[in-house]
Amino acid sequence: MSMSTSTEVIAHHWAFAIFLIVAIGLCCLMLVGGWFLGGRARARSKNVPFESGIDSVGSARLRLSAKFYLVAMFFVIFDVEALYLFAWSTSIRESGWVGFVEAAIFIFVLLAGLVYLVRIGALDWTPARSRRERMNPETNSIANRQR
């Protein structure tokens, strides 16, 4: 690399280099300022989590059902779908009928996926036993009478 080429690269990217230096310097300044201005209390109560003035009871680790993660994933998927459809709706005049057909196919594929999720029971919150009881109430009442 010749001297003129490296000078051209530096001249071309000087603003980004200054931005990086200022950003890293600001982060370091805030960390050092927090270290100097922060408290130094070393009591036993410093290691206990604070919950609005109430002593904590039990474990803070809660086991969540996988259903919550599924719902979160479905939300992200359909939120991205809405993002794509919004982008399509802003350019509907330029895309014409071809864009309309492509958007319709996109919606159809996502609706087919949603129907599939409903059919396999991915969106059901109740266990299979209570779902059977809800579907066949006469069988459930006969079983209760025999007991």
UniProtKB/Swiss-Prot annotation:
Catalytic function, reaction form: a quinone + NADH + 5 H(+)(in) = a quinol + NAD(+) + 4 H(+)(out)
Highest taxon above the source species: Bacteria
Compartment(s) of residence: Cell inner membrane
GO molecular function, one term: NADH:ubiquinone reductase (non-electrogenic) activity
Membrane topology reported for the UniProt record: Multi-pass membrane protein
Transmembrane regions: 16-36, 68-88, 98-118
GO (cellular component) term, any one: NADH dehydrogenase complex
E.C. number(s) listed in UniProt: 7.1.1.-
Biological process annotations from GO: respiratory electron transport chain
Key words, A-Z: Cell inner membrane, Cell membrane, Membrane, NAD, Quinone, Translocase, Transmembrane, Transmembrane helix, Transport, Ubiquinone
Keyword NAD attached: yes
Enzyme class: translocase
Family (UniProt): Belongs to the complex I subunit 3 family.
Function, in words: NDH-1 shuttles electrons from NADH, via FMN and iron-sulfur (Fe-S) centers, to quinones in the respiratory chain. The immediate electron acceptor for the enzyme in this species is believed to be ubiquinone. Couples the redox reaction to proton translocation (for every two electrons transferred, four hydrogen ions are translocated across the cytoplasmic membrane), and thus conserves the redox energy in a proton gradient.
Assembly description: NDH-1 is composed of 13 different subunits. Subunits NuoA, H, J, K, L, M, N constitute the membrane sector of the complex.
HAMAP family: NDH1_NuoA
Descriptive protein name: NADH-quinone oxidoreductase subunit A
Organism listed in the record: Escherichia coli (strain K12)
